[in-house]
């Protein structure tokens, strides 16, 4: 009887070498990739200058990603004296050698996206068609979501949340209640897409009697958008994992900021997505072991757009000076930002949530003209010092802030490019932040342009 031929064990499966033991398999699970993801997150209430940091780091990146939010975010990046404004696009799109990904956690307003591309093309953005990749799982923001956003805010009257009225909240609500519409729906059977769209319209009509949408006109628009969008769309999860296995450098640009996170921010005065580290994982389909550096971007003072508690807010001439010198007007909303002192109690909290491995302190130069600078170090609630950040906005509105006062430097820092050349008082200010948070400051912003960054060496 002929013996059966022996079948040799495969040496590789799906491109992975076959391991010989559980220990080896476990080790591969702990570190299956040749590279790690660098994440840039806002550490306060947004507008910290994340786009500038991403633009700087994107020069060395192969891929830059957005993972959450929509066109309620706003980044300005200055390149060769030209201001590029980004709302949906990753600001790394300026870098012609890297891919830009809009991940599944982002909600996309297609009219806004194509308008943003056109505006930045007019300013010199080129060849984006070969570099922009959009997730097929991302949800779509329709004009009707923006209409609903305005109606909901109007219903709240004097208790409105101060949203950007970009339709972000209603779109994420549609996603959570499972009647949202994704990019893959638009690119699939258009008849089915039309039925889903009509169902969404009818749902809102039941909620708002005066709600009106020209369904035929909208579907005609979106048939055109489908053709324009199709070449840009793919499965970004597989693309990213493949890129990490190849050792590609991946950079993630968080939108909004930690204190606007729907779970950890000053709820309900927050955005509708997770803009802390968790949103990076769910918004791109990445496991925790892919994360390397987590860079927290900290403005040298604190700002906030819209309503909600703000313990260190200034209502005096110093607040006005910060608004004026800092050009504190929202990129997206054009609203004047509220300004206040740096809040270390708040930053300790966001550092716990996000696990920063490094910091970038921006707009240090805005403090150049102040003789004295106050820094919040803790809060008192009901007469007692607390060692936590209040989860209730009622409690947060009642805290008494404990400040320390440090000397200003009364000299311009705008031309400084080495940490050792900063005035001693400015160096002390940076060291105060580092020592309190236990996180190194690696970069300091002292002006608008990408060249106005101090690289802090050990």
Curated annotation (Swiss-Prot):
Keyword Cytoplasm among record annotations: yes
UniProt keywords, alphabetically: Cytoplasm, GTP-binding, Ligase, Magnesium, Metal-binding, Nucleotide-binding, Purine biosynthesis
GO annotation, cellular component aspect: cytoplasm
Location in the cell: Cytoplasm
Co-factor binding comment: Binds 1 Mg(2+) ion per subunit.
Active-site residue numbers: 47 (proton acceptor), 75 (proton donor)
InterPro entries, A to Z: Adenylosuccin_syn_GTP-bd, Adenylosuccin_syn_Lys_AS, Adenylosuccinate_synth_dom1, Adenylosuccinate_synth_dom2, Adenylosuccinate_synth_dom3, Adenylosuccinate_synthetase, P-loop_NTPase
This protein's pathway: Purine metabolism; AMP biosynthesis via de novo pathway; AMP from IMP: step 1/2
One Pfam family, short name: Adenylsucc_synt
Enzyme Commission number: 6.3.4.4
Descriptive protein name: Adenylosuccinate synthetase
Species lineage: Eukaryota, Metazoa, Ecdysozoa, Arthropoda, Hexapoda
